[in-house]
Amino acid sequence: MKIFGFFGKRASAPMARERLQVLLAHERASLGKSDLVAILREEIIAVIAKHIQVDSEKVNVKMDRDEKVSTLEIDVEIPLQAGGRAA
């Protein structure tokens, strides 16, 4: 029985595995970033088009990657007479 090990650090393997999974997800996203943004843009347009008419040229999708966080910015210009309910 380890007397001094009782108060020591817990196993860090699960934490390291989780960090590695997050890192790999970010790396995979950055490798296919342009493809991912294009796919997301088309899917967003398709979902919005189910409810209102929107010009596909008025939909902008942008992905930024920082050291600690990645952001996805979506800008959709919806006309006042869109044929749907106002938000």
From Swiss-Prot:
Keyword Ribonucleoprotein set for record: no
Lineage top rank: taxon: Bacteria
Coiled coil regions, renumbered to chain: none
InterPro entries, alphabetized: MinE, MinE_sf
Gene Ontology biological-process entries: cell division; regulation of division septum assembly
Keyword list, A-Z: Cell cycle, Cell division
Gene3D superfamilies the record matches: Cell division topological specificity factor MinE
Record's function text: Prevents the cell division inhibition by proteins MinC and MinD at internal division sites while permitting inhibition at polar sites. This ensures cell division at the proper site by restricting the formation of a division septum at the midpoint of the long axis of the cell.
Xref: HAMAP family: MinE
Family: Belongs to the MinE family.
Protein name: Cell division topological specificity factor
Upper taxonomic lineage: Bacteria, Pseudomonadati, Pseudomonadota, Alphaproteobacteria, Hyphomicrobiales
